[in-house]
Amino acid sequence: MEINKLVCFSFSLVLILGLVESFHYHERELESEEGFMGMYDRWREQHNIEMRSPERFNVFKYNVRRIHESNKMDKPYKLKVNEFADMTNLEFVNTYANSKISHFQALRGSAPGSIDTDPNKDFIYANVTKIPDKVDWREKNAVTDVKGQGGCGSCWAFAAVVALEGINAIRTGKLVKFSEQQLVDCDMTNAGCDGGLMEPAFTYVIKHGGIAPEASYPYVGKRETCDKAKIKDVLKIDGRQNVPGLDEEALRKAVAHQPVATGIQLSGHGLQFYSEGVYTGDCGTEPNHGVGIVGYGENEKGIKFWTVKNSWGPTWGEKGYIHLQRGARKEGLCGVAMHSSFPIMNDPNPPKDDPNGPKDDPDAPKDPKFKTTQRLQGIRTKLLEL
């Protein structure tokens, strides 16, 4: 059976889980070849990149110049020289964003954004009339720390878990990390590290009795055999819901009540090097990456935004988050309003004070550190051969 798949941006590079300091440079270094070479060598050392080639150096120069010029403009967002500075945007997109949701929708006979496009069809928040001007579920202790998916294309699992963790915290008052690895290993309707969708992940949780805490079923960054012995102290949900497509107001109603999983297209020079602020730049509307929306608001200049949690670790963007402009187009900027869904949890299960409910293990190991240097070198070697 043909299914849509989000084959995720899988950050198998150095920033995934280990913190990397920001890369700084002086404007005068951009004035000479020697200055650029010094920057390039310093950047390679910071990111543990052994390869030193004229082609990569030329791309590095091109990207640094574009980043520098962009940051001199009056834009509501800033860019930074990150670990992708020696990759062209085409290489970046082809390497980390090679899935086209619209392609799979066409095979199924669906139009883009056709998920529940009838605004009132089963949408539980359709009749909500009053919602706050600003919501940030991080401030309400409903969002866990930013995680890292590593070299596994499991963004769909991380996005689904953002929504599951959020609704559990809202209903029970307990913030618990849940297991992306269980979804990667056990949800056979999705493709593990080769991509997937959030809606089938929610359906798996419903049909298979729940999702375990991360402490019981920790993340390893690859698909393994489903280990049912680790599935205990589970969170159960009562259903799932799609947000009407091409409708940011419907999406805002949903996010006002709980974190939501969605798909976006992360492409374009700006997103490759995004650092901070409200992103208003170029990107497409063919979602290829799963993320969680954990809030919305408006900045001091009146630009409306979505607060989006990514799964590339805390050193990308704004400590692992990106603010995407809200209200830019019917699909939402980067297609954020085209493919959104959330779990339904009517009552705490177990009840709030049940000692047998899901809980974090304070002694559980943190996310594993992925060995990335060899993989990084392999990517660059392959790009040079193209």
UniProtKB/Swiss-Prot annotation:
Carbohydrate attachment residues: N127
Q: Which InterPro entries match?
A: Papain-like_cys_pep_sf, Pept_asp_AS, Pept_cys_AS, Peptidase_C1A, Peptidase_C1A_C, Peptidase_C1A_papain-like, Prot_inhib_I29
For molecular function, the Gene Ontology terms on record are:
cysteine-type endopeptidase activity; protein homodimerization activity
Provide the transmembrane region boundaries. none
Ranges of compositional bias, category Basic and acidic residues: 350-370
**Region T-cell epitope. MHC class II peptide able to activate CD(4+) T cells of the ragweed pollen-allergic patients indicated by significantly increased IL-2 production compared to non-allergic individuals. Not recognized by IgE of the patients allergic to ragweed pollen, residue ranges:** 6-20
Q: Write down the EC number.
A: 3.4.22.-
Q: Which UniProt keywords apply?
A: Allergen, Autocatalytic cleavage, Disulfide bond, Glycoprotein, Hydrolase, Protease, Signal, Thiol protease, Zymogen
Task: Share the entry's pH-dependence remark.
Answer: Optimum pH is between 8 and 9.
Q: Name the catalytic site residues.
A: C155, H289, N310
Record's family? Answer: Belongs to the peptidase C1 family.
What does the function comment of this entry state?
Cysteine protease. Hydrolyzes casein and synthetic peptide Boc-Val-Leu-Lys-7-amino-4-methylcoumarin (Boc-VLK-AMC) in vitro.
Stated name of the protein: Cysteine protease Amb a 11.0101
Organism of provenance:
Ambrosia artemisiifolia
Give the classification, highest ranks. Answer: Eukaryota, Viridiplantae, Streptophyta, Embryophyta, Tracheophyta
